[in-house]
Regions:
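Catalytic alpha-helical scaffold of carbohydrate-active enzymes acting on polysaccharides/glycoconjugates
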Residues: 2-194
Length: 194
């Protein structure tokens, strides 16, 4: 299907044009930087999690097939991150006294309470990265809303804090509205524009 170019286009490709707003950062800074660590190990697709197959979307492997059984190499990639990689990153940020935002998948954080406590004790922000990895494109809106509520409840219970950031990662046409309806978020990282 080709879109009729004589009709109004539903996306804003113009934005501010030649007159973008200029942010006034604290202390006269000219740029703001946010360091983000995606913590997803234990939230990826895996038959152990009740999924039809193994993860294939995000991996160090090139174009892996999804297996309808345990994929030991794929599991190993995620296990390294949870068992070793994340601790190495935390030590480096702690050494430099740098703040970190963790995009935490709720089911992944549940599977590693020691790490979740470390994130909180080190003062790092934990933004909600959904319940688990699900492609929400064709999931009913009510299910997506229920998953958002469950993910936020898990984070609140585990950290004692309400997440101020949201990042689904595999969003749907409903996600942004659901985030706005849920309310209380300072930002939504599913939008990559300005």
């Amino acid at each position: 299907m080709i879109y009729d170019t004589t009709l109004p286009y539903p996306r804003d490709l113009i934005g501010y044009g030649q007159n973008p707003p200029h942010a006034q950062w604290p202390g006269g800074a000219r740029i703001a930087v946010q360091f983000v660590l995606n913590y997803e190990e234990g939230g990826e697709n895996a038959v152990l999690h009740g999924d039809a197959g193994s993860e294939q979307f995000l991996s160090e492997m090139f174009n892996p097939a999804s297996y309808p059984e345990r994929h030991m190499s794929m599991e190993g990639i995620y296990e390294y991150g949870a068992r070793a990689g994340v601790w190495r990153i935390l030590r480096e940020f702690e050494k430099r006294k740098l703040p970190l935002t963790v995009f935490g998948v709720s089911n992944a954080l549940q599977r590693h309470p020691e790490l979740t406590r470390a994130f909180v004790e080190l003062g790092h922000e934990i933004a909600c990265h959904g319940l688990k990895w699900i492609h929400y494109q064709h999931i009913p809106e009510a299910v997506e809303r229920a998953h958002m509520q469950e993910a936020m409840d898990i984070l609140q219970r585990m950290t004692g804090q309400r997440a101020l950031g949201w990042y689904t990662g595999r969003d749907s046409p409903n996600t942004r509205r659901l985030v706005a309806d849920y309310g209380g978020f300072a930002y939504d990282s599913d939008y990559y524009g300005d």
